[in-house]
Amino acid sequence: MKTVGILIFDDVEELDFTGPLEVFGMAAHFGADCRTVTIAEQRKEIRCRHGLRVVPEFSLDDAPPLDLLIVPGGLGARTHARANAKILDFVRQQTGMVASVCTGALILANAGLLDGLTATTHHNSLDLLRQHRRSMRASERVSSSTIASRHRPA
């Protein structure tokens, strides 16, 4: 069974983690051999950006081995989470695939996972990503093989 972990933190954007949670939950419902878990720095209630309160299943210290870690964005990703040494260490230690949603890219950049790569994020945070000192390139549009990502206002 594959394990998908979704990192959550105070001021995480609800849609950024509930969207992937729903997608992988439905995949399991229709037969995919996977489970999805939520992970936070501690096993205590997280207050999301718009007031939703969530208690994670695991802390960073007791999280199971992951096949995929999803790092969502939100105000928390732009402020405290991207500078949290414990979160950055956890992200760095992942041996499976790692993906970000929106400003979760700032956490990946600070953890060094985007070194040598081109990455994008929410258009209002692109300058924050561009300020990153490591060898990465921030861009409005990124494409690789058959996947493309672009973030501009509608």
Question: What are the residue ranges of the model-derived segments?
Answer:
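Short leucine-rich amphipathic alpha-helical surface patches
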Residues: 28, 133, 153-154
